Amino acid sequence: EEIKVEKLDINISSAQGLLYAHGALWVNINGKNAGVHRLTDTNGDDQFDKDEYLKPMQGGGEHGPHALVLSPDKEHIYVIGGNHTKLPKTDTSVVPTNWDEDLLLKRLPDARGHAANIRAPGGWIARFDKDGKNWETVAIGFRNQYDMAFNIDGELFSYDADMEWDAGTPWYRPTRLYHVTSGADFGWRTGTGKWPQWYPDMLPPAYDIGPGSPVGVTSGLGAKFPAKYQKAIYCLDWTYGTMSAMFLSPAGASYTAVREEFVASSQMRMTDAVINPYDGAMYYTVGGRGGQSELHRVTYIGDESTKPVKAKSANAADRKIRRSLEALHKPESPNAVNKAWKYLGHNDRHIRWAARIAIELQPTSQWQDKALSEKDTQASLTALCALARQGEA
């Protein structure tokens, strides 16, 4: 079967994010003219002839601007920046914007100076509308997540990097799969400043994978694979040439995961993967750092059904509660304090998180007295955490 490769007649390079949506090719450039561009064909000749530089970014290299992904409802485009990419000015933020290092003990920076001067928010995820406007900060506290994907429930997942030189230290954090919810902070801080996952104001991973170099992430939805593999999230590791199929199980308002090695070869430096909606095959690329670039295809051969999956996951009620609270993640949200307060003592960490963020985004004058007088132990701890983060002594 002949593969046709057509070089686009466009004056851009170093694109680490590519997305065709809404009649345009959206490009996130990592290098000269870094940031988000929109390429369109204005005269119908099947060539992109217009380049709109929508959002400049400061940052580059392997920790620079990364992936672009379309939301399930196709109304938003999500964009990633690694921890060497300064978060550009956004119009709104569902993350409270007074982030800081929040360290009690003196930090030891990396002995070789890596990211020694990088401070919060670290790596980030933002989104903008289909016109390239109305930018909003979604989550922070990553190290260097290249890519992301939505699962069958419309929930977002990303695969974050470790700092390999930290291996064996108490502050080492392995590469990990994150369930990225509204207003999340995953606690990356440079050097020894990384937050442990028991901190109440950071969210834990869905799964710790181990040493590696995270690159592409994709959902199996649309693949002509058995149902289990259609529902999986695939995480690609450049260093070890491994693609992991992550099988998600609902756990309250979030998920846990089980990992299966799906494709592996130490000779293949995998970079990204995608499901082709026309033939139902998975395609993945290999290359990087001057190595040979390749395109590979994965298809299923067997007797299991490959009908498209439609069933949603269990625990929909918990996710519904969390999402109703996330709808309050905006300043001056009417009645947000009263609506969210009863969930501050919930036994699910992600529901408590969503409730606390909704409250933190409101003026403290609306809820400081409630926080100081709350009697329920768990609700009191969550409310006082919010007050410690947002109140003024």
How would you label these PLM feature ranges?
Residues 1-327, 358:
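Beta-propeller domains with acidic blade repeats across secreted/periplasmic ectodomains
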Residues 287, 298-393:
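Long, ordered, helix-rich scaffold segments
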